């Protein structure tokens, strides 16, 4: 996983939030801590909010907070919310005209889809609270 990916940012942020789940954090505070731009943070956290992992409040005392207890947020929840696939499935490729290439593409695509399913299953076995060691 790339250190600057949206997934890394989301997991890092949620892990910190799990340490004090009732605390509200601003995009600017999160961005400063993560060493990135607040706009990037808002985009990533917006996806997590859409997935029901975070809530947000506007205004002077506003910010972001966990929508669930940390034990109820798995790494798979975060991964799926961001729609940032680690395993490229090859589903977007054109159908090759060569029958050998077509069969090869189909089989490799099936293997990659199996890997993706296994990855999501394994990510689902670990919660954000476990990442923190709490």
Language model regions located:
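Alpha-helical residues within the helix-turn-helix
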Residues: 32, 49-50
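Non-DNA-binding regulatory cores of transcription-related proteins
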Residues: 67-134
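Short helix-capping/hinge SLiMs at alpha-helix to coil transitions
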Residues: 18-22, 68-69
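Beta-hairpin "wing" of winged helix-turn-helix
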Residues: 51-67
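A short alpha-helical element within helix-turn-helix/winged-helix DNA-binding domains
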Residues: 25-35
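Short alpha-helical segments that sit at the start of domains
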Residues: 1-13
